[in-house]
């Protein structure tokens, strides 16, 4: 590397290191927030592409995707590596790999600010240097005699304003083509992810799964409580209706009818008692009225049956002779 390039790189790095520590901490938190959101929207190509400002062409929607965060390559540690594999697992089509560097800024970045803004231009130059080093690392993974699968590696820069949800500026540069062994490279990228970030993202993924399970489990509990409340209210209403039907206006019945009504009254009392327990004591006055009605019916029936005198067809009374044993 020429000495001038090295001096420019050192001056750029030193200038960015002189930024306030508060700004650096905010930038790190923003990076972690971007990683979490990537995990959240990764299953949906549309949401993933929207998060990155439309970086990917729509033809990649049918491709299978793999996501790697902060991969430690030999020279650089790119923030994100997104691999798009052909739709058919046995296909020998081109693999598209996006090596992405995220830059967080205090103000919105655009095509002009990355040229003239002091901080934006330094971040842009640093990102170019990092992406160039990542391409050199992929060149080291090239198969010496060919025979592998063609990878199109696309270096990309994405600028996020620190309080924004979508990028303010992105740029995809000319891709480099490499003949690589796909399975070996995917395994290499997976093993070279930063462990601390991987653990943090795994904890985030577990929290998202628990939250989703909690939402699904809360719905059956609400339905069960609603069904139980409906049953208790229905029993209470039925017990109240029965108590009103057998109030003080009930007529005197015969002895056999009194016996049946007594057993029926007992069942009604039991049902009303159960309804009172379930319904919260709303039918207590009806139960007490029903008890008094059943007792009065039994007493009236007993007195009436004691004075019944047998009569013949003409209405004359007679007594049956008793037989001695």
From Swiss-Prot:
Localisation per UniProt entry: Virion; Host cytoplasm; Host nucleus, Host nucleolus; Host Golgi apparatus
Pfam family, one: Herpes_UL24
Assigned keywords, A-Z: Host cytoplasm, Host G2/M cell cycle arrest by virus, Host Golgi apparatus, Host nucleus, Host-virus interaction, Late protein, Modulation of host cell cycle by virus, Virion
Region ranges (Disordered): 222-286
Compositionally biased residues, Low complexity: 247-258
Disulfide bonds: none
Protein task: May participate in nuclear egress of viral particles. Plays a role in the dispersal of several host nucleolar proteins including NCL/nucleolin and NPM1. Since deletion of host NCL/nucleolin negatively impact on nuclear egress, UL76 supposedly acts on this process through its effect on host nucleoli. Induces cell cycle arrest in host cells at the G2/M phase following by apoptosis. The mechanism involves the inhibition of host mitotic complex cyclinB/CDK1.
Protein name: Protein UL76
The species this protein was found in: Human cytomegalovirus (strain Merlin)
Gene: UL76
């Amino acid at each position: 590397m020429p000495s001038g390039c090295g001096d420019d790189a050192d001056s750029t790095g030193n200038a960015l290191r002189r930024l306030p520590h508060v700004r650096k901490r905010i930038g790190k938190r923003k990076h972690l927030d971007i990683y979490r959101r990537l995990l959240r929207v990764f299953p949906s190509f549309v949401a993933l592409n929207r998060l990155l400002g439309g970086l990917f062409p729509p033809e990649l929607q049918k491709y299978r995707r793999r996501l790697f965060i902060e991969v430690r390559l030999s020279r650089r540690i790119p923030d994100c590596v997104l691999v798009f594999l052909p739709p058919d697992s046995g296909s020998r089509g081109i693999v598209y790999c996006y090596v992405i560097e995220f830059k967080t800024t205090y103000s919105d970045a655009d095509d002009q600010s990355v040229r003239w803004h002091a901080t934006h231009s330094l971040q842009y130059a640093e990102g170019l240097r990092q992406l160039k080093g990542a391409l050199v690392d992929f060149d080291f993974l090239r198969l010496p005699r060919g025979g592998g699968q063609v990878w199109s590696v696309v270096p990309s820069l994405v600028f996020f304003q620190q309080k924004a949800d979508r990028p303010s500026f992105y740029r995809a540069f000319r891709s480099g083509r490499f003949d690589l062994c796909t399975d070996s490279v995917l395994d290499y990228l997976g093993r070279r992810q930063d462990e601390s970030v991987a653990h943090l993202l795994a904890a985030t993924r577990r929290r998202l799964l628990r939250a989703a399970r909690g939402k699904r489990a809360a719905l059956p509990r609400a339905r069960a409580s609603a069904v139980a409340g409906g049953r208790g209210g229905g029993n209470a209403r039925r017990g109240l209706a029965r108590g009103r039907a057998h109030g003080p206006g009930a007529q005197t019945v015969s002895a056999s009818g009194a016996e049946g009504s007594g057993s029926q009254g007992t069942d009604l009392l039991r049902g009303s008692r159960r309804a009172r327990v379930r319904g919260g004591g709303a039918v207590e006055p009806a139960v007490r009225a029903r008890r008094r009605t059943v007792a009065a019916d039994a007493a009236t029936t007993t007195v009436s049956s004691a004075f019944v005198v047998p009569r013949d067809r003409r209405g004359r009374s007679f007594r049956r002779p008793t037989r001695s044993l």
